[in-house]
Structures are given as structure tokens and as C-alpha cells.
Amino acid sequence: MMEQRVSLITLGVDDMELAAAFYEALGWQRAESPDGVIAFDLISQTLGLYPLQALADEVGLPVSELGKGAVSLSYNTRTKEEVALVLAAAEAAGAEILKAAVDVFWGGHHGYFRAPDGQLWEVAFNPFSALSQAGAFRWNGY
């Protein structure tokens, strides 16, 4: 049986330093990690950056079969107003804004950006699933 959690999210990227610089421009700090891997410790998880070709080699698939950007990562904010601020910071760091901050049918507020290596990020405020004081998210619906 598998516990209901995700410990590490690994993004296959073309240029590790460029990808790391993007997240550092958003205020994230690198964690100590071995050569060939860049990690950012998150609250109860880690975001890892790994060379796309190395990831393909590791799983035994050609890069063309890995897919890229087919998953949306979500960053939840404490306030509705913070959504636009995070989107602006992402754009200033080199992201492409795909959807400006807007109210959502379920009562929240969100927008989307694409990171320089193609990953899709949602920035969202969910008034029904408030973040803990430490920033941890727990789904309480909408």
C-alpha cells in the first residue's frame, strides 16, 4: 500500500541553470544536492530539476515520448490579491503569462503561466482551502 503523498516532483529541463535561475528569481533557494541535480525544498516536498535527456535515459524512453508541460503544478496563495503579484513576478523572471488572474466559477481566483522550460503553473487563491501558517496546503474542496 502506498501512503497518500508526493515526496518529490522532478521536472525534466533542457537547461538546468536557466531553469534554476527562473525559480531563484521567484525567491526560491536551492537545497544542497549532488552534481547533476538541482533541488528546491518545499513544505513537505522537494522540486527537483534534472536534465531532460538524462531523465529519458533513466526511464528508457526517447525524449519525444516523455511529454512536456502536460501537467499543471499549482501554487496557492494566501490572498486573492497575491495571485496577480505572483504572476507578475513570474513574468518578470521570464515566464509567459497564459491566463491573467480571474475569478473562477467555483469561488476562487487564479491565473496560469508557462515556465521557461515549458512547465505549466497555476497560481490560485482558494478561499475554501486556506494555507496553514507555515504555508502547507490541504484540500478542503470548493
Where are these regions (language model features)?
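Vicinal oxygen chelate
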Residues: 1-8, 26-114, 125-142
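Long, hydrophobic N-terminal alpha-helical segment
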Residues: 12-13, 18
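Conserved active-site tyrosine of GNAT-family acetyltransferases
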Residues: 19-24, 90, 118
